[in-house]
């Protein structure tokens, strides 16, 4: 009977050791899982913080770019509302707004043309000639006054007559110079007004909202880099419109 009891005790002790070993393995596995979950959550939180920082930087740059674009926009667009732009009755921004300004009473604000370099040089030359014509007349008046004081009765009459004649000649010269200056100015103004009335102009709107004023006077001063695809398309439409109207006028004149 003694050996049987020893076998049972040994079997019970072996079973308890196996259970304890499996329990310890479960505890270790749960601890590893907890550590893995904590590390994963920490890395995820760090990644979220980094993405939020990048998003804030991106929003700041977008805000700056938006403010710069608002500063570049013309003042007329600052006051317009979105519902006005979305209205179907209003004309679109890309449409061509063109005005051929000829001799017509409908023009309320005529074009103001700056004088050219030739006109400025001509006016400066006229002013110089008028100032030079005034200086010798004043130089002639001074000796006549001296001769009046030093002359006798007969000589004074002769000097007075010569003085009056010279004064009248000087006045005639002044009047003729003024008339010539007025005539030249009138011709220049009439020519400038005629040129302004007969000059063809066009207003082009680019895709960025910039309005370009095109005319024969400033055709060499236009920056070609500002003319984008929208502006070129508008100019092509203008050319087609002008060709159509010219052909229509020719047909009307032949009839």
UniProtKB/Swiss-Prot annotation:
The UniProt entry's coiled-coil ranges are: none
Transmembrane ranges, per UniProt, are none
Name the UniProt key words of this record, in alphabetical order: Cell cycle, Cell division, Centromere, Chromosome, Mitosis, Nucleus
Q: Region (Disordered): which ranges?
A: 1-24, 107-156
| Gene Ontology biological process | cell division
Please give the Pfam families that the UniProt record associates with this protein: Nbl1_Borealin_N (PF10444)
Q: Where in the cell is it found?
A: Nucleus; Chromosome, Centromere
For the keyword Cell cycle, the answer is yes
Polar residues bias (residue ranges): 124-135
Q: Which GO terms describe its cellular component?
A: chromosome, centromeric region; nucleus
Q: Does the keyword Amino-acid biosynthesis apply?
A: no
Q: How does the annotation summarize its subunit structure? A: Component of the CPC complex.
Q: What does this protein do?
A: Component of the chromosomal passenger complex (CPC), a complex that acts as a key regulator of mitosis. The CPC complex has essential functions at the centromere in ensuring correct chromosome alignment and segregation and is required for chromatin-induced microtubule stabilization and spindle assembly.
Q: Which family does it belong to?
A: Belongs to the borealin family.
From the Swiss-Prot or TrEMBL record, give the protein name.
Borealin-2
Q: Which organism is it from?
A: Danio rerio
- Taxon lineage: Eukaryota, Metazoa, Chordata, Craniata, Vertebrata
């Amino acid at each position: 009977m003694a050996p049987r009891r020893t076998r049972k005790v040994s079997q019970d002790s072996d079973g308890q050791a196996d259970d304890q070993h499996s329990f310890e393995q479960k505890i270790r596995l749960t601890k590893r899982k907890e550590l893995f979950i904590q590390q994963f959550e920490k890395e995820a939180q760090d990644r979220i913080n980094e993405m939020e920082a990048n998003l804030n930087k991106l929003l700041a740059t977008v805000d700056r770019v938006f403010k710069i674009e608002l500063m570049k926009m013309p003042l007329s667009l600052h006051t317009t509302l979105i519902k006005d732009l979305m209205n179907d009755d209003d004309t679109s921004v890309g449409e061509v707004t063109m005005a051929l300004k000829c001799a017509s009473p409908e023009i309320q604000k005529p074009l103001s043309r700056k004088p050219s370099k030739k006109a400025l040089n001509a006016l400066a030359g006229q002013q110089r000639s008028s100032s030079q014509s005034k200086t010798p007349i004043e130089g002639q008046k001074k000796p006549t006054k001296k001769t009046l004081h030093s002359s006798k009765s007969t000589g004074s009459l002769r000097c007075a007559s010569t003085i009056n004649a010279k004064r009248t000649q000087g006045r005639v010269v002044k009047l003729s110079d003024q008339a010539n200056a007025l005539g030249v100015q009138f011709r220049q103004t009439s020519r400038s007004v005629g040129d302004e009335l007969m000059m063809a102009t066009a207003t082009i709107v680019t895709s960025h909202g910039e309005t370009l004023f095109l005319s024969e006077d400033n055709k060499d001063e236009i920056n070609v880099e500002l003319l984008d695809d929208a502006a070129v398309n508008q100019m092509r439409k203008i050319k087609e419109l002008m060709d159509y109207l010219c052909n229509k006028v020719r047909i009307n004149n032949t009839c």
